[in-house]
């Protein structure tokens, strides 16, 4: 049986950032990162990787600020970040209230759209605000970059499903799909949307977290250099120029709940139709170029704030990031470290 001080279950962006911070905080600890697929191949793989300074509450805005600052030093280190101009479309009657959901660093000012393909009718009752502080990332590539540096200090175990968590004196025995057992003093559960796994389903049921489908469509038109990220705040949607892939991406809010990660399936006609209907209000030319996209799911908390909590003295849950795993991962990891520092192990 292998014995670790800390075992992290889930190798998405949240689990990977937690691993980075654990190694920094506890350089002498034995640490493992366990992932049922390849690290980054779950929700992180499908993520648009969009980061902008927004939060539904003061807590989430602070988490957004922390994470934004965390990512900045990696810009000059070859991280797959792509910085973008940013604009916000919202109702004229409540634009000041809308801006309160964003950090002051966004610096929003009333403007015209920077995207010539965006059309707002004169009587539509909407305004455009220009801001700053946005980027998108290739989240899967970022995870691989960080894993390369982590492998010398973290035991990365990919392709292994956790089949059971057995409490033991001083920690947990983690049963794996290859019939091995790994012991750990502290277990950090960062499962993304895999909430229904028998190993932890009952342990987290009381958190009230549910899994919702996420849809983003691709638009077969190459963005011009300098094209902005456009946030449609009232619709909870955004349009991002994916320069690294040579197409636009439009993400909108799906309301299909209680899905399972293994059963989201491919895009359906209704997914594409819903995207076209919404985008046609603002950019009919782009709406007409929607042909394909991506679909997966993520975990959503009742409060729409990430959940970082101790389930017992040896088990921490970190998740329910509400589709913002990349945007908030560093702050989530910081909260995990805070919980760990309160425990001797």
Residue map of PLM features:
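Helical element adjacent to the flavin cofactor pocket in flavoenzyme catalytic cores
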Residues: 129-177, 190
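Central helical "cap/lid" subdomain
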Residues: 180-228, 268, 285
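Active-site lid/adjacent beta-loop-alpha segment flanking the redox-cofactor pocket in flavoenzymes
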Residues: 225-311
């Amino acid at each position: 049986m292998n014995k670790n001080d800390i075992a992290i279950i889930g190798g998405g962006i949240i689990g990977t950032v937690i691993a980075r911070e654990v190694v920094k905080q506890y350089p002498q600890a034995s640490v493992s990162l366990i992932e049922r697929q390849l690290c980054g191949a779950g929700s992180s793989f499908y993520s648009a990787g969009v980061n902008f300074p927004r939060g539904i509450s003061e807590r989430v805005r602070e988490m957004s600020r922390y994470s934004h600052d965390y990512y900045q030093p990696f810009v000059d280190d070859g991280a797959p970040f792509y910085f973008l101009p940013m604009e916000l479309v919202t109702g004229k009657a409540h634009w000041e209230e809308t801006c309160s959901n964003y950090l002051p660093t966004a610096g929003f000012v009333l403007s015209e759209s920077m995207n010539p393909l965006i059309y707002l009718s004169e009587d539509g009752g909407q305004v455009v605000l220009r801001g700053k502080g946005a980027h998108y990332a290739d989240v899967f590539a970022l995870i691989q970059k960080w894993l390369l540096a982590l492998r010398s200090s973290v035991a990365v175990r990919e392709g292994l499903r956790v089949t059971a968590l057995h409490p033991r004196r001083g920690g947990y025995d983690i049963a794996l799909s290859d019939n091995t057992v790994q012991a750990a003093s502290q277990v950090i559960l960062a499962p993304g949307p895999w909430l229904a796994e028998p190993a932890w389903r009952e342990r987290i049921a009381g958190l009230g977290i549910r899994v919702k489908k996420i849809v983003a469509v691709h638009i077969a038109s190459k963005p011009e250099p300098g094209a902005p990220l456009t946030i449609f705040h009232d619709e909870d949607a955004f349009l991002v120029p994916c320069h690294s892939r040579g197409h636009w991406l439009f993400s909108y809010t799906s309301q299909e709940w209680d899905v399972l990660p293994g059963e989201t399936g491919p895009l359906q006609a209704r997914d594409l139709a819903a995207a076209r209907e919404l985008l046609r209000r603002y950019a009919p030319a782009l709406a007409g170029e929607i042909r394909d996209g991506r679909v997966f799911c993520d975990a959503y908390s009742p409060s729409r704030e990430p959940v970082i909590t101790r389930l017992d003295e040896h088990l921490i849950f970190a998740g329910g990031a509400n589709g913002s795993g990349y945007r908030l991962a560093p702050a989530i990891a910081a909260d995990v470290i805070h919980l760990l520092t309160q425990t001797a192990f």
